[in-house]
Amino acid sequence: RLLSRGLGDVYKRQVILAASTHKEEDEIVIEAFKDLKQEKLFQGHFVLAPRHPERAKDLQNICLRFGLNSRLYTNKQSFDDVDITIINVIGVMDDLFQRSRVTFMGGSLIKRGGHNLIEPAYFGSPILIGPHTFNFEEIVDEFISSDAALLVRNKIELVNAYRDVIQDENLATSLSSNAKNIIKKRRGSTVIQLSYIMDIIRNK
């Protein structure tokens, strides 16, 4: 698989993912990764998948500012030398969601309207989401009210939510199960179909 080739040994390790992030929230996410790394909570690997992969090298510079070593997904650098892998290709998100212990969905800590929760939910990754989700308001509200995703409003809450899911297997399982129940209940519904359509339309 593409992911196993690009992530090597990390393919078999726990992945902490931030997906579809935008320029204005990258520093928030990277600083959250730094805080978690300093706590030494887990033996996994941080993965950052920006909404626009062409920004990957800019994200490496931000990592350096925070004292974190990073590598691009397409780079064969050893994982022993890096803290974060930055995804700079398309076509690997399904595999990432399957491997992720927990996923923050970007575009939601800033006023971009969020992104589709259905994919990470389908693959069983517990979901964290920011407050700015007006593009997907109905489905996000259902996820939050059904305890199928955790709402985070800032960096501190993001760190706390990542930590909670990493440390609490019951919480992780509950979030994943509740999200899958929503998808099962809504299968074929207009809301689910519109979620995919809106994510394509607002891919900016």
Where do the language-model regions lie?
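Alpha-helical structural signal in soluble globular domains
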Residues: 32-39, 58, 62-66, 142, ...
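Short acidic active-site motifs
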Residues: 55, 88, 92, 157
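Single conserved hydrophobic/aromatic residue that forms the stacking wall/gate
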Residues: 1-11
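Catalytic binding pocket for nucleotide-activated donors in carbohydrate/polymer assembly enzymes
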Residues: 98-181
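Donor nucleotide-activated moiety binding/catalytic core segment of transferases
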Residues: 71-117
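C-terminal alpha-helical cap of glycosyltransferases
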Residues: 186-204
